[in-house]
Amino acid sequence: LAVHSLKDLPTESHPGLLLAAVPPRQDPRDVVVARDGLTLGELPAGAGVGTGSPRRVSQLSALGLGVEPVQIRGNVDTRVGLVGAPAADGGVDAVLLAYAGLLRLSRAEVVTEVLDPLQMLPAPGQGALACECRIEDDATAQLLAVLDDPDTRDAVTAERTLLATLEAGCSAPVGALAEVVMGDEGDELWLRAVVGDISGAPSIRRSATGSRD
């Protein structure tokens, strides 16, 4: 048995492994952790906003707020610790993080703004977990099956199918979010996606609704 952050799984599955369960998804949105309790729009022009994600850099640039993306590395605590730190120590005015990671670490109190997907679409699969086992291990697969959430599985499958169709990896500047919604003929999937460019070129945003099948 292996449990992963689903957004980090390769789009092409390993032939010997089974994705036995995708549990209910944590909040998939991105958040801002900023000094002085500021929101993204309240940061002054030229403020440094830390992120290690090309997807976030491209969408942040597209918002036209005049802030400066700053490349950062490290775990969640390291990144949060950079907020308000001296510039000589790599400090920034704010960082962009996945809400799910902070919730799982019980660090939601540091969040100063939860970003609407209209501003910042998350990575495909963000907020979801993947439970894998060996494809021939029926006993483990049956035990894991009770954890599976069909709505979450269908949503992340749509997001990852988009990523595979674009032949993009998990580090590409691609955001996607699918949700199960009620349509005229029952449940449907609503998929929103963005393909960005870290050079500042215009992003491409599209949305579509279709059958869960």
Segments from the language model and where they lie:
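Fold-independent oxyanion-binding glycine-rich loops
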Residues: H4-K7, V22-P23, R35-D36, G52-P54, ...
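Small-molecule-sensing regulatory modules
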Residues: A62, G66-D213
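Short, Asp-centered acidic motifs that coordinate Mg2+ and/or phosphate
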Residues: L1-V3, D93-A94
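A conserved helix-loop-strand patch within extracytoplasmic ligand-binding domains
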Residues: L6-V67
